[in-house]
């Protein structure tokens, strides 16, 4: 999406679409607009060119500080399934970035924040209690989302330790 905020200036943003339904009416969800990492209008990485490098080598990716649209789920614009798809898509982007950096960094530190645990716990904690008022009329389909996530995050720690197979220091918080 191109925006023209002033003379001879264009700012580019990116969005993702999620098809909610086609009948009886077309319902299409659009994410909030992200800064295009291929042509960032503002610094979104350090060095500035790192965002462009990632976009060129891995494809465009989410750039908002809170990419997972918790408001859309809270306001029932999207359902839990759509939110999970969105959240895991963003997590997979970050994993690719992390392992790319880990692979290419011979000295120094590689730091990555995997905030999927925070997002999913905030949005799915209520599913642990079937009596929670927000669960009225719903099945227990999402009661294991948090547990499953932590199993997956444990596997991520294992893959990280394998990728850093030497005796380097690893810190997981």
Where on the chain are the PLM-derived regions?
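His/Asp/Glu-rich, glycine-adjacent segments
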Residues: 1-137
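Metal-dependent active-site segment of extracytoplasmic phospho-/sulfohydrolases and closely related
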Residues: 148-173
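Extracellular loop and loop/strand-boundary signature of outer-membrane beta-barrel proteins
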Residues: 142-146
């Amino acid at each position: 999406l191109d925006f023209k905020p002033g003379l001879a200036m264009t700012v580019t943003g990116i969005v993702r679409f999620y098809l909610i339904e086609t009948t009886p009416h077309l319902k299409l969800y659009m994410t909030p607009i992200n800064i295009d990492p291929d042509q960032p209008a503002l610094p979104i990485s350090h060095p500035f060119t790192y965002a462009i490098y990632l976009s060129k080598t891995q494809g465009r990716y989410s750039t908002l500080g809170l990419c997972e649209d918790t408001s859309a789920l809270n306001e029932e614009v999207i359902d839990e399934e759509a939110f999970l798809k969105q959240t895991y898509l963003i997590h997979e982007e970050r994993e690719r970035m992390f392992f790319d950096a880990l692979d290419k960094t011979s000295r120094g530190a590689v730091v990555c924040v995997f905030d999927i645990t925070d997002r999913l716990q905030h949005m799915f904690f209520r599913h642990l209690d079937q009596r929670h008022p927000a669960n009225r009329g719903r099945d227990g389909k999402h009661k294991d989302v948090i547990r499953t996530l932590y199993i997956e995050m444990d596997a991520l720690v294992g893959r990280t330790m394998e990728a850093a197979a030497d005796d380097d220091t690893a810190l997981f918080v």
